[in-house]
UniProtKB/Swiss-Prot annotation:
Natural source organism: Rotavirus A (strain RVA/Human/United States/D/1974/G1P1A[8])
A family per Pfam: VP4_helical
InterPro entries, A to Z: ConA-like_dom_sf (IPR013320), Rota_A_VP4 (IPR042546), Rota_VP4_MID (IPR035330), Rota_VP4_MID_sf (IPR038017), VP4_concanavalin-like (IPR000416), VP4_helical (IPR035329)
Protein family per UniProt: Belongs to the rotavirus VP4 family.
Name of the featured protein: Outer capsid protein VP4
């Protein structure tokens, strides 16, 4: 039958030549792969060896341990620890602001009996009585608050590392005291912190306060071994003062130059304007259901002034890592519902590809030292009213995210006429106020930005910032480096797909019932499915190859692959156990369906939720245990074939995406049934479940345990004519037991007979299935 086409795609039976593989790899790297290469990026290798040139980087990386520096007198900055490495007994340092703070630290070697010693402090000779009965060095902190007062020992540090620290911060002077390895800090307040200077008599280091834990570690445990070698030579403190040359915002600098090539550094300030694209697809039927609200790629072109120069810019905005939400207002055809709507949140990313007509982008082929800095922007969602035929319209309203710059790399933008080498700016997201809601529904106070109206009536969102890069260009300024992608002009594939989806959805009304049933019964293969596009066999095979490669990554192919792995695991586990049957029922061959059912409680809501999940998985079992009846995939493939033949826009580039989307999105509302004697058990993707007798169509209680047993061993049948349609048909026309059984089994001949008789109930059911074949 027609669903054979899906099984053929799943078997990956078509060979792929090397040219196709190379073409696919190049395409994937250009379109789908985003990397963050750090400070170096290139699209092609350069034709000559690069010189190192001048590397300008505005990022200051502050070392944890800066030094050692020679002894000196200076005013230390606030917020930095001065770590002094004492190498002799005597005065280690003196510090004062000449108003309310005088302090000096003297070092006492181990094993010193009480003795009077003379020290020269602040130009004065002072005598202190000192002693040290321990095996470690002692550092006495002598302090006075006025030039008229005497010094006294305020704190003592006992240390085997011989390191002393002092910090100016928060209106206080902080030092270490106690005994290593458990020395701690304490502070002394002063009214004139900024004017405190220090005279250091030993070599010292500078550590930022943000690394105070490291300073504490050094005080208590000693410096790293590399600092204790004779190869480390103290430098004068003046070597720490570097004259920084700040680059202009917009300038071109020659970094290095040879006879044919030169490296140019381009510094640019930029204004990025972008907008989100979206697609809203309404389902067929009575007009109360929406199938998809999704983000799409959006291009935007604009002009702005940069240093008095008019700049023409082009941006492409896309999103990654979207979150899928849904809303189901009920099971009736007049109940409002959205099968899937996309929301971007904290786990999502926004990509903006930027190009302008300046020299920086003219030769953007060989690039290094790429860096950027951009502001953040808040994007707030607007309102979208769902125009249902009767009743108050539900309105999706609100939602907001903030975009924060997270990286930049090279990219290529595809426009209708040319491909542009661009910069791709990546933004991470944080959710913001307000939350979004769907008025007149239960969906309230959810955070993120939904795809319904992400631009909120704004023509664009705007971000300002700057970037810098070094590009290898020709010495001849009139020469433009060839760009590989500019050899061929490529139409925007996403735009083609959007137009094709609209055409496909509009063709649903033109499909004849009899033609559909006949086509669904044919064993469609690759050639017959795609031969309607072009007559040549070679092109058809090439198309089939492209479709197969794209189809590999579809949800259906992935699910089949996972199911195969489960089968393999179940078989290997069963072979090691005595009870094969019990083991196979525990590890079922469509990802534990029987377990899901058997774990269901007697609660109606729980059964509804579980059966909805299970019914979506039963499609996989039906595909590997084909029955004589017609399946939903037969109808799906037949509709796909019909629309391909009728389409005027289908082509080699768009066909793989359309076939893959059709396998995932055609007929989202499916029902499956299992027969046992004269009883039928039926479940659907909306969570409804029925059990009824074949003869009378009278409902009987739905036995969950019985269903769990049957679903493991019995064949699964697509409920083309579902229970509601069967009951309606029997009540209005009356059908025999044989007709009922054939309709229950989805017998194609019986379906064709009812279609030929122009039965309105059966015809309406098939029409509804065709209308569900939307993209």
């Amino acid at each position: 039958m027609a669903s054979l086409i899906y099984r053929q795609l799943l078997t990956n039976s078509y060979s792929v030549d090397l040219h196709d593989e190379i073409e696919q790899i190049g395409s994937e790297k250009t379109q789908n792969v985003t990397i963050n290469p750090g400070p170096f990026a290139q699209t092609r290798y350069a034709p000559v060896n690069w010189g190192h040139g001048e590397i300008n980087d505005s990022t200051t990386v502050e070392p944890i341990l800066d030094g050692p520096y020679q002894s000196t007198t200076f005013t230390p900055p606030n917020g930095y620890w001065i770590l002094i490495n004492s190498n002799t007994n005597g005065v280690v340092y003196e510090s004062t602001n000449n108003s309310d703070f005088w302090t000096a630290v003297v070092a006492i070697e181990p094993h010193v009996n009480p003795v009077d010693r003379q020290y020269t402090i602040f130009g004065e000779s002072k005598q202190f009585n000192v002693s040290n009965d321990s095996n470690k060095w002692k550092f006495l902190e002598m302090f006075r608050s006025s030039s008229q007062n005497d010094f006294y020992n305020r704190r003592t540090l006992t240390s085997d590392t011989r390191l002393v620290g002092i910090l100016k911060y928060g209106g206080r002077v902080w030092t270490f005291h106690g005994e290593t390895p458990r020395a701690t800090t304490n502070g002394s307040s002063t009214a004139n912190l900024n004017n405190i200077s220090i005279t250091i008599h030993s070599e010292f280091y500078i550590i930022p306060r943000s690394q105070e834990s490291k300073c504490n570690e050094y005080i208590n445990n000693g410096l790293p071994p590399i600092q204790n070698t004779r190869n480390v030579v103290p430098l004068p403190l003046s070597s720490r003062s570097i004259q920084y040359k700040r680059a202009q915002v917009n300038e071109d600098i020659i970094v290095s130059k040879t006879s044919l090539w030169k490296e140019m550094q381009y510094n640019r300030d930029i204004i990025i304007r972008f907008k989100f694209g979206n697609s809203i697809v309404k389902m067929g039927g009575l007009g109360y259901k929406w199938s998809e609200i999704s983000y799409k790629v959006a291009n935007y072109q604009y002009n702005y002034l940069r240093d008095g120069e008019q700049v023409t810019a082009h941006t492409t905005c896309s999103v990654n890592g979207v979150n899928n939400f849904s809303y189901n207002g009920g099971s009736l055809p007049t109940d409002f519902g959205i099968s899937r709507y996309e929301v971007i949140k904290e786990n999502s990313y926004v990509y903006v590809d930027y190009w302008d007509d300046s020299k920086a982008f003219r030769n953007m082929v060989y690039v290094r030292s790429l860096a950027a800095n951009l502001n953040s922007v808040k994007c707030t969602g607007g309102s979208y009213a769902f125009s249902i035929p009767v009743g108050a319209w539900p309105i999706m309203n609100g939602g907001a995210v903030s975009l924060h710059f997270a990286g930049v790399t090279l990219s290529t933008q595809f426009t209708d006429f040319v491909s542009l080498n661009s910069l791709r700016f990546r933004f991470s997201l944080t959710v913001d106020e307000p939350p979004f809601s769907i008025l007149r529904t239960r969906t309230v106070n959810l955070y993120g930005l939904p795809a319904a109206n992400p631009n909120n009536g704004n023509e664009y969102y705007e971000i300002s910032g700057r970037f810098s890069l070094i590009s290898l260009v020709s010495t001849n300024d009139d020469y433009q480096t060839p760009i590989m992608n500019s050899v061929t002009v490529r139409q925007d594939l996403e735009r083609q797909l959007t137009d094709l989806r609209e055409e496909f959805n509009s063709l649903s009304q033109e499909i004849a019932m009899a033609q559909l049933i006949d086509l669904a019964l044919l064993p469609l293969d690759m050639f017959s499915m795609f031969s309607g596009i072009k007559s040549t066999i070679d092109l058809t095979k090439s198309m089939a190859t492209s479709v197969m490669k794209k189809f590999r990554k579809s949800k259906l192919a992935t699910s089949i692959s996972e199911m195969t792995n489960s089968l393999s695991d179940a078989a290997s586990s069963a072979s090691r156990n005595v009870s094969i049957r019990s083991n196979l029922s525990a590890i079922s061959n469509w990802t534990n369906v029987s377990n899901d059912v058997s774990n269901v409680t007697n609660s109606l809501n729980d059964i509804s939720t579980q059966t909805s999940t299970i019914s979506k998985k039963l499609r996989l079992k039906e595909m590997i245990t084909q029955t004589e009846g017609m399946s939903f995939d037969d109808i799906s493939a037949a509709v796909l074939k019909t629309k391909i033949d009728m389409s005027t826009q289908i082509g080699k580039n768009t066909l793989p995406d359309i076939v893959t989307e059709a396998s995932e999105k055609f007929i989202p509302k499916r029902s499956y049934r299992i027969l046992k004697d004269d009883e039928v058990m039926e479940i659907n993707t909306e969570g409804k479940f029925f059990a009824y007798k074949i003869n009378t169509f009278d409902e009987v209680p739905f036995d969950v345990n019985k269903f769990a047993e049957l679903v493991t061993d019995s064949p699964v049948i697509s409920a083309i004519i579902d229970f509601k349609t069967l009951k309606n048909l029997n009540d209005n026309y009356g059908i025999t037991r044989t007709e009922a059984l054939n309709l229950i089994k989805s017998n194609p001949n019986m379906l064709r007979n009812f279609i030929n008789q122009n039965n309105p109930i059966i015809r309406n059911r098939i029409e509804q299935l065709i209308l569900q074949c939307k993209l």
